[in-house]
Amino acid sequence: MKNWLFIFICFAFFGLSAQSEKSPNFVVVFCDDLGYGDIGSFGHPLIQTPNIDRMAVEGQKWTQFYVADPVCTPSRAGLLTGRYPIRNGMTSSKRHVFFPDSPNGLPLEELTIAEILKPLGYATAAVGKWHLGHLPKFLPGQQGFDYYYGIPYSNDMDSDKWGEYLEQSEDPDYFSNTKFFNVPLIENADIIERPADQTTITKRYTEKAVQFIEKNKAQPFFLYLAHSMPHIPLFVSEEFRGRSKTSLYVDVIEEIDWSVGEVLKALEKNNLDKNTVVVFTSDNGPWLLFKTHGGSAGPLRAGKGTTFEGGQRVPTVFWGPGIVSPGVIDQMGATLDLLPTFASLSGAKIPTDRKIDGYDLSKVLTQKSESSRKEFFYWAFAELHAYRNEQYKVHIKQREAIHYGRPTLELDSPELYDINADISEKYDIAETFPRVVSKLLNKMQLHLKDVQDALPDQLAGRMAKE
């Protein structure tokens, strides 16, 4: 009897050891155009986001988290590669993102999070918006992902009825129609629906994400869940339409929160929650041009398309009950940091043949140590607009809002803001701190020299019309 008891204890011990030594899973929930002020835990008084708020309480709420660029394509390239988009040609002054007539995509020599995790036996999936090249040779399957399901670019593209849509889009209760937009829904490399029924897209993304978790629960996995919402045009399922009794935009956000809850349930149901890191964030700030359909940056200045805080500081939460130490992190971090952080937590190798701009935040997550990110360069449309070091941020170029006919403003003299004391960037203190301005400008010059070997512009090209 004692021998059997001993054997049972040994099996139990080694089983627990194997479980604790298993590489962690990673889930990134990446919203489209979600503003800093659009989440309950980040200050919105009306939007109900109980699942995201739960993540913020049980995990880490990051109040100073940045994206690599204030628009879609370059921001996504930065997250997946850990590199400023200027380095791999994924930002442009001519065309700001990829379009359905774009011949290019994320250069295949770039390495993504999926590609550095694959050698460790990770299953990988990209579900949702891709926007890094829609041609077969640039789809997620060519960038380390085992599975793809989603719309390959923005949900407002491939349309000849933009004018008709815009005439109605400012109505807060306007519910768009699929007929305006001919975007395809792709599974792996095959178009399975066109136009995609966007009223069910958040639900279908969620179903595919949960299926992936269920299918791969016995091995480590990386799930990149990139929602198409709340980028305009706004779509929501019948179940959520009108549920908030506030506006269509709020309905959309609350459906995304439901989606987050379904992902957390799947992890908990399969006993994966204590060995998984879930990141919730956004690709850039809100598209304020669309008013009630465009969200809110809360206390931050401006929104999408700008290098003010509202354009590149995004609501971010890290959750993982067995890995992430709970708390509020009022330090800098960025989506650029996800690649080196996931590499550190998993034991993956970071490429050494190229510059990685991200920092390893793993000790902040596990021990609430001090963040190693002390600076951030604000790029937009292939131009360096601003730079932050510690609490000080200097601007040399600006755009107030994304509007394709509006040029970048070259400032006559630099503007300086103390971001810790002046989160809304209202008070220019450049004249009071000329030495700080000089120091930051020197850093910008060094950075510009550092990116001189960048790949050529990948976004500017157009395919010939048939």
Where are these regions (language model features)?
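Formylglycine-dependent sulfatase
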Residues: 2, 16-415, 421-466
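Sec-dependent N-terminal signal peptides
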Residues: 4-14
